[in-house]
Regions:
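Short, Lys/Arg-rich, polar N-terminal cytosolic tail immediately upstream
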Residues: 1-12
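Alpha-helical transmembrane segments
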Residues: 14-28, 44, 131-135
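Short, hydrophobic transmembrane alpha-helix segments
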Residues: 27-39, 56-58, 79
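Short, aromatic-rich membrane-interface segments at the entry and exit
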Residues: 36-44, 60-65, 84-89, 150-155, ...
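Hydrophobic/aromatic-rich structural module bridging two neighboring secondary-structure elements via a short loop
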Residues: 55-102
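Alpha-helical transmembrane segments of multi-pass integral membrane proteins
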Residues: 88-104, 119-144, 165
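Alpha-helical transmembrane segments in multipass membrane proteins, preferentially the mid-helix core
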Residues: 135-149, 156-175
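C-terminal transmembrane-bundle signature of multipass membrane proteins
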Residues: 167-231
Length: 231
């Protein structure tokens, strides 16, 4: 047990350990200050923080944690009538994370499965992914409108950026983190609007602010890893 903990400790860099610890402390403090936000949302935020640091390392464990986070977050979103978030995470992010987990395990870097083989997306591939995003977004617009989704504009933008993020993740491309960072910004706005009505949602606002910092690091680190893998 001690050897495993030592191995895990040495796996992360000093910066990554600081980033993870800071993220967990901020999320915990937010929950302590606003305990009415609910234990479920707190658990989701902690799982999310762990998933992002593993994803930033290109580790498939991150995708497994995203599946768990997506299911819990979908439940929290349902309680807020954010049906767009609920449908996006339960119906798109979780299944795509499962597909990404399979893809990452099938495409390891070297002999170890602890790091995925990273690839860059070409111009044609980017164009196809962007074009696919348009009909998906339009379809979700009508679905969300039918369900009377609160704050439908940011919800639709969240769908678009989430689709980009999960697709780039599946394709093992560093742009996944950039798309998730864009999604974080939209969700910050979404939960800010909810927090104005009820401060109980401030921990969710804090959650995605923390995720934004982690996703930015993920993008930077994946580009660094890609250079290392290419050398």
């Amino acid at each position: 047990m001690k050897s495993k903990l030592r191995s895990l400790n040495s796996y992360f860099t000093g910066f990554e350990k600081t980033l993870l610890t800071s993220s967990l402390l901020i999320l915990t403090m937010s929950y302590i200050i606003f305990p009415d936000s609910g234990t479920l949302s707190f658990i989701a935020s902690l799982i999310g923080a762990f998933s992002l640091i593993f994803c930033a390392k290109g580790n498939p464990v991150g995708q497994l944690l995203i599946i768990i986070f997506s299911i819990i977050y979908a439940v929290v979103s349902y309680g807020m009538c954010y049906y767009g978030e609920m449908i996006t995470y339960a119906g798109m992010t979780a299944p795509m994370a499962a597909a990404s987990l399979y893809t990452w395990l099938r495409n390891p870097y070297g002999r170890s499965r602890s790091q995925v083989k990273i690839r860059s997306a070409g111009g044609k591939e980017l164009a196809v992914i962007i074009l696919l995003t348009i009909p998906v977004t339009v379809l979700f617009y009508f679905i969300l409108k039918y369900f009377g989704t609160a704050n439908i504009i940011p919800s639709i933008l969240s769908v678009a950026t989430s689709f980009l993020a999960v697709t780039f993740t599946l394709r093992r491309c560093a742009l996944y983190a950039l798309a998730y960072a864009m999604n974080d910004l939209i969700l910050i706005v979404l939960w800010l609007l909810a927090s104005v009505e009820n401060t109980v949602y401030i921990p969710m606002l804090t959650c995605f602010a923390v995720f934004l910092v982690n996703d930015i690091y993920g993008f930077i680190n994946w580009n660094r890893l890609m250079k290392q893998q290419s050398s």
